[in-house]
Swiss-Prot record:
Membrane topology: Single-pass membrane protein
Compartments, as annotated in UniProt: Membrane
Basic and acidic residues: bias regions: 1-17
Chain spans, region Disordered: 1-29
Membrane-spanning residues: 38-60
Keyword Isomerase: no
Organism: Escherichia coli (strain K12)
Keywords: Membrane, Transmembrane, Transmembrane helix
Protein name: Uncharacterized protein YpfJ
Cellular component, GO annotation: membrane
Gene name in the database record: ypfJ
InterPro entries: Uncharacterised_pept_Zn_put (IPR007343)
Highest taxon listed in the record's lineage: Bacteria
Amino acid sequence: MRWQGRRESDNVEDRRNSSGGPSMGGPGFRLPSGKGGLILLIVVLVAGYYGVDLTGLMTGQPVSQQQSTRSISPNEDEAAKFTSVILATTEDTWGQQFEKMGKTYQQPKLVMYRGMTRTGCGAGQSIMGPFYCPADGTVYIDLSFYDDMKDKLGADGDFAQGYVIAHEVGHHVQKLLGIEPKVRQLQQNATQAEVNRLSVRMELQADCFAGVWGHSMQQQGVLETGDLEEALNAAQAIGDDRLQQQSQGRVVPDSFTHGTSQQRYSWFKRGFDSGDPAQCNTFGKSI
């Protein structure tokens, strides 16, 4: 991506040298040992990546809530600047899209942190991956997740990283359009299988919205050769079917909450090819 020199967002808060603080409360996270711990790590990491708050899984003995202060490396500075630029591009993209709808886009906040931080949805921890909190309209990210994408998920490249931010912003768009609260209401009295199916549709729509952002980047000449493949690879790398096969050796479709690799690929591509949020209605057609 040709992102250097572009506008940075004014909606970024940097907490990387701040303590989580005693007001966060609650227990810390202790990963179980053995295969169960590995499975839980993958589940929480990927759920956080797609905006699902799994803080309730964080049980065990309390851990220190104090983050040590250390210097920020040049690579981390570069990642922070990149993240701020990407957020700014989503602001421009959705500002234009909402104007076409006759609406005003309310920009989300983004918080960069290390380890753990307070959020409107409870304690945020880096083990959760990036996530969006609808209660405070904020995207949270520990920038070390970019390394996790490369080393643990096999999804490398700046456009793949931008896709992460654009997906979380997609959840913010769902909130503004009234989609997220309606889905949460439907899930309250639904069976677990139906809760999961609704979650899949939410996540695929956020993928499609990320594709709409990607289309805007292409139209502006920001993308370089290979960028689209980076994002599509990221979408495929974290499909429920692939992750379940890797972590437990079998696939359980009724337990899917994010969609298959092919579904993620297809819905991102739909948004990317059309540039039209109206093409992202995952609730009105077969997925």
